[in-house]
Amino acid sequence: MTLTEYLKTFIGRPYIWGGNGTGKTAHGFDCSGLVLEGLWAFGLYTGADTTAQGLYDHLTKTATWKEGNVDNAHDGDILFFGKSLSKITHVAVALGDGLMLEAGGGGSACKTAATSTGFVRIRPIRKDVVACVYLKK
C-alpha cells in the first residue's frame, strides 16, 4: 500500500480543526493532521503534531526530502499552500494528474472549515500552491 492509497481510506471523514485522527479528534482531521497520519503510518515523520508551516520547515531541513516542481507534482508529493514559503497555511498530498487529497472545505479559514461541508476529499490542486516536497529515492 502506498501513502496515497492509505490516505484515500480516510475520504469522507469530517474536517475537524486541530484533528489528527486520535483522541478527541479520532473521527476527523485537519489538513496537517491528515498528512501527518500518513507520514507517521509509513515511518516518514517521527515528530510531534504540527502545523502545515511546521511540517514544511521540518521536511525541507531533512536529508530524506527534496523540494520539487509545483507544476509537475507526482503521486505522493506533499503540497504546501499559502502566500509565501514563510506563510504556509495548508498542506495536501498530490495524486498526480493535477489532483490532490486534502482535509478541508467549508470555509476559507481553518477554523471555519469545520462545517458540514468540510471533509477529506480529492480535488484539483489549488492555485496558491507554493511548494512541493517529495521523498528522495
PLM feature segments, named:
Residues 2-3, 66-68, 116-122:
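Intrinsically disordered, low-complexity boundary segments flanking structured domains
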